[in-house]
Design a protein with these regions (language model features):
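Transmembrane alpha-helical segments of polytopic membrane transport and secretion proteins
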Residues: 1-17, 239-263
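Hydrophobic alpha-helical transmembrane segments of polytopic membrane proteins
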Residues: 206-245
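Alpha-helical transmembrane segments of multi-pass membrane proteins
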Residues: 11, 57, 61-70, 103, ...
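Generic hydrophobic transmembrane alpha-helix motif, especially the helices
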Residues: 100-135, 142
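Transmembrane alpha-helices
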Residues: 126-130, 163-195
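Short cytoplasmic-facing helical segments at TM-TM junctions of multi-pass membrane proteins
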Residues: 139-178, 207
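Transmembrane-helix boundary motif in ABC transporter permease subunits
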Residues: 69-99
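Periplasmic/extracellular loop-to-transmembrane helix junction in inner-membrane transport proteins
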Residues: 3, 29-72
């Protein structure tokens, strides 16, 4: 029984039940017709209705594609600069002020700034890139910096080159840090993309755009039901990402690699 309760997947499922019950309580506390805080029943009814609409998939694909571009750009920069900074502390200290600045800038300020500086249509991509880069960068740096020096010295004794030590020793051992950073930044980038789409108001066929439109739809008596239903797509996607993280983490642990944030 104790082993059953301590199982992470069982606890995850119990957590989902708790969140659902909390959702029901909050919806009953605020209103009963779904105009302000719709219940899970109303939300899922609308959710399944949206599942039958091809436009929903176009919006989801549009948002994921734009988010993927921003995430991919930030990953490339983080990969290159993170490896350099992880292997050369002087490079890390040189880039540290930039990382602090990027971490500190409010996302809303970036939205307003890039709407003015570049095409509003492309602003969400650049915002995702800037927000994700520091997280991914720290993941690469942290992973490489925490590799046991004994492995590096053993590779040097075997005659491994500088690039071979990075590719076949440091990066594999740094994977737990990198995976955690990737999952965290991916989840954040999805939320940022939706928010940026909603705030710019210029992107077509995006989840942020349809959420903003649903909120201001005067013909809809319960606009928040539609908003919650579209938001549910993001929640379910993040649950899938979390499951993938658990599977990858379990695989890394099976391979004998140290796991970070595994509680």
């Amino acid at each position: 029984m104790k082993k059953f309760i301590s199982n992470r997947f069982v606890l995850f499922f119990l957590g989902v039940i708790f969140v659902t019950l909390l959702w029901i309580v909050l919806s009953l506390s605020f209103d009963r017709n779904g105009a302000i805080f719709p219940s899970p029943l109303l939300t899922f009814q609308k959710f399944f209705e949206l599942l039958g609409d091809s436009y929903t998939y176009a919006c989801l694909a549009h948002t994921l594609a734009r988010m993927g571009i921003g995430f991919g750009i930030s990953f490339i920069f983080a990969f290159v600069l993170g490896i350099l900074a992880g292997n050369h502390p002087s490079m890390y200290h040189f880039l540290k002020p930039l990382i602090v600045v990027l971490r500190s800038i409010p996302t809303v300020a970036l939205v307003f700034l890039f709407v003015v500086l570049i095409t509003p249509r492309d602003a969400p991509i650049l915002i995702v890139t800037i927000i994700c880069f520091p997280i991914l960068f720290e993941g690469f740096v942290g992973g490489i910096s925490n590799v046991d020096k004994q492995y590096i010295e053993a590779a040097q004794i075997d005659g491994a080159s500088y690039f071979s030590r990075i590719a076949f020793v440091k990066l594999p051992l740094a994977m737990p840090y990198i995976v955690v950073a990737m999952v965290s930044s991916f989840a954040l980038s999805f939320k940022i993309e939706i928010m940026a789409e909603a705030m710019t108001g210029y992107t077509r066929n995006g989840l942020g755009n349809v959420i903003a439109f649903a909120k201001g739809d005067a013909e809809d008596a319960t606009p928040m039901v539609t908003v919650f239903a579209y938001a549910l797509f993001a929640v379910l996607l993040m649950l899938i990402v979390s499951l993938i993280q658990e599977l990858v983490t379990a695989w890394l642990k099976k391979k004998g690699l140290a796991i970070v944030n595994n509680n």
